[in-house]
């Protein structure tokens, strides 16, 4: 059985975070715990053990951490740039026609739906848009969907009738 140890994560921006881990846990589990408390996406986190950057796919044991030791980590947050990213809108009708959209990570879903209306004539109310397997929801921003350059948006429309 894997021994349980305490992990303490400190950051300039948040209060001290403490939780339990085992040597078989991956660093990504710590990243996910931090995300649940801070809303900082895993891709925007850098965890440091002393000056060594921890890689999300590796187990804690691969860093030679003593079983009995409390792990003290430092969280750094990388602010992603807010430049315009080229995304491709794929329509479910019109033989999968593609449209290039230039979207910022800070763009609201409502703004993106207005862009979609300008190229497809489908009003936002009738649009169902998915990105990275998630339905875009009003009130959110595109950073919530982990968009990257070249990400695909899939457009379908609400059916009218029964």
Swiss-Prot record:
Compartments, record wording: Nucleus; Cytoplasm
Knockout-associated phenotype: Spontaneous sporadic apoptotic death. Higher sensitivity toward endotoxin challenge. Abrogated TNF-alpha-induced NF-kappa-B activation and reduced induction of NF-kappa-B-regulated genes. Impaired TNF-alpha-induced I-kappa-B-alpha degradation and nuclear translocation of p65 in RTECs. Reduced expression of LMP2.
UniProt cross-references to SMART domains, sorted A to Z: UBQ
Entry's Gene Ontology BP terms: aggresome assembly; myeloid dendritic cell differentiation; positive regulation of apoptotic process; positive regulation of canonical NF-kappaB signal transduction; protein modification by small protein conjugation; protein ubiquitination; regulation of mitotic cell cycle phase transition; response to tumor necrosis factor
Keywords: Acetylation, Cytoplasm, Nucleus, Repeat, Ubl conjugation pathway
Induction text: Rapidly degraded by the proteasome. Cell-cycle regulation with highest expression during the S-phase (at protein level). Over expressed in hepatocytes by drug injury (e.g. DDC; diethyl 1,4-dihydro-2,4,6-trimethyl-3,5-pyridinedicarboxylate). Inducible by the pro-inflammatory cytokines tumor necrosis factor-alpha (TNFa) and interferon-gamma (IFNg).
GO molecular function per UniProt: proteasome binding
Tissue-specific expression: Mostly expressed in thymus and intestine.
Family statement: Belongs to the ubiquitin D family.
Protein name (Swiss-Prot/TrEMBL): Ubiquitin D
Annotated source species: Mus musculus
Lineage: Eukaryota, Metazoa, Chordata, Craniata, Vertebrata
């Amino acid at each position: 059985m894997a021994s349980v140890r305490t992990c303490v994560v400190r950051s300039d921006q948040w209060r001290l975070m403490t939780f339990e881990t085992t040597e078989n846990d991956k660093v990504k589990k710590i990243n996910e715990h931090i995300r649940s408390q801070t809303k900082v996406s895993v891709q925007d986190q850098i965890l440091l053990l002393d000056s060594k950057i921890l890689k999300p796919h590796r187990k804690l044991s691969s860093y030679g951490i003593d079983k009995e030791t409390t792990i003290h980590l430092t969280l750094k947050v990388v602010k992603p740039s807010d430049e315009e990213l080229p995304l491709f809108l794929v329509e479910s009708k019109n033989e999968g026609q593609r449209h290039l959209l230039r979207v910022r990570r800070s763009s609201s879903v409502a703004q993106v739906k207005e862009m979609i209306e300008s190229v497809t004539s489908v009003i936002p109310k009738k649009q169902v848009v998915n990105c990275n397997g998630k339905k875009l929801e009003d009130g959110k921003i595109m950073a919530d969907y982990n968009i990257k350059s070249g990400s695909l948006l899939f457009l379908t429309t609400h059916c009218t009738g029964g």
